[in-house]
């Protein structure tokens, strides 16, 4: 393995002259007016010893001098405190709590304008068990039965009351990876309030295949009315939350005329033909508002058009062999990603960016919703390693660049576009300082106008992390692992693609994480399966361990008893400013537990009752070997994060965990940080990745004192 630092400004970037200013925290922080309207998110649960632990949100809209009163049963028990959590040693489960907020600390002899939260009762335990309505299973055309388990979740405020609702994707037990044949059950989406009330159910039908790479759903307020919508891919037979076919929400006569009883699955359960559509649903009711053709279609066209040399099958674009699949079986062209991006500025309404392909051709389709209709903003197409183009709503090319060249740090010629550069996830944020979001698409980045920002050419990978990983460098950084030769991992400048650290390896580097786990070093630490131990952000190894490889490929322990920190999700959980980790014990159940870095190794971090996550409510992770939570986000309470797992004893409950560890630090809700909020929106996509902040928390907390 080789490690070195090298400046690499990709040729694709140089040719375009794309060198705007560096992004900063300010540029990735929306104005007060643009922040989600959230309530205090007050939560109470058993304290670590006796009593009740209460926590609540500090908002990004609050003044620097904001302070709080804590009320128990209508009586103030803590007066004008600065912290956003409080332990009531005399509290009990029978009592109720409210938070009174003062934007400026009032004088004792003067009345002050104040905001009073709703009253909450303490949870009975360290987690909340949310009942969910498990769908009935079924039998596939080949006679095999299946049932349902809770899979990925997202959040949005669908009714505008300042509290998030949960949108849950139910996966059938026969969901498939794109590389596998087989029928699947229908994909089902539910919406629940945090008290367990079900608002609606959407059934995407038999013509949407179930699997991690197919249904990518976005939950966000796209039209600026203060209420979140849902956007996802649909097809003939998809039913909205009112039980109506989504095709009836179209303004296109051909979409309205689709045969909703047709079954487009082939004899091995794949869907290679038929209508492909995109639908926006009303978040409160699940009602389909508008449905359009999905772009590009299987034959690279817009709507029902096909690219030159492609053809129709039974009236619809036929899956193209140019996607590059062996035997043309519907793999590479059926891999989707999605994200929410503020392409016109953080204070403007966002776009849905729906993506198709990353092993060869890469397409990113930006779509706007004005409250009534979905409209194309642009369609980016990286059609070869050397050529990219941008098309408008009619499919007309409005910008194109050909003949780009690019070389990797070792001098090998590599892709100069987003062709073959995407990952199993993406990231969104203003990386170039222009006030608009860009899309980090694996080893490449796409500008807010749909043009190519840069490409490192280092290829596809399973994981990437965008944040201010190195607070002493201007702008943001990306850490990514790679699946293809020369494999390995890299740390790069998120604006230019300049390679800061680079490791090569002999095999697929399938896991890697960037997180601030060690307070002795500024910035985030890096670890991945191509490098033994843990590195600081400058590339220095700060711990031995992990594994090393013999020339014949077998691995041996590098330090007896050492294991890398978990290569899954980072999380803010305890009271310090470093990040903890979500780990899993492995097969067959992938049971989750908390982990903390002690400076030399990762150690289990039990809950205050001495138990681990998996010992509470039969909690289990999802997505098989990826072993991810159903959702991780700052849902309520103070700035520490919540994590959701499903109850494997009945698959009919979600377990929501929140911390009860006091902290002295006051930090605005993470959901008011733009990069973090965008990360929660794309978290459910493909191989789920954790959300990251757009700033370095220890520095932010110092400013908030």
Model-derived features: positions:
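Beta-propeller-forming repeat regions
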Residues: 32-40, 49-51, 58, 81-83, ...
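Position-driven detector of the extreme protein N-terminus
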Residues: 2, 17-20
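Beta-strand/beta-sandwich contexts
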Residues: 45-46
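Bacterial N-terminal signal peptides that target proteins for export
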Residues: 1-9
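Solvent-exposed loop/turn segments flanking beta-strands in beta-repeat/beta-sandwich domains
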Residues: 59-72
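Short strand-turn-strand beta-turns centered on an Asx-Gly dipeptide
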Residues: 72-77, 448-449
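Boundary at the C-terminal end of the N-terminal hydrophobic targeting segment
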Residues: 21-25
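Bacterial N-terminal signal peptides
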Residues: 9-17
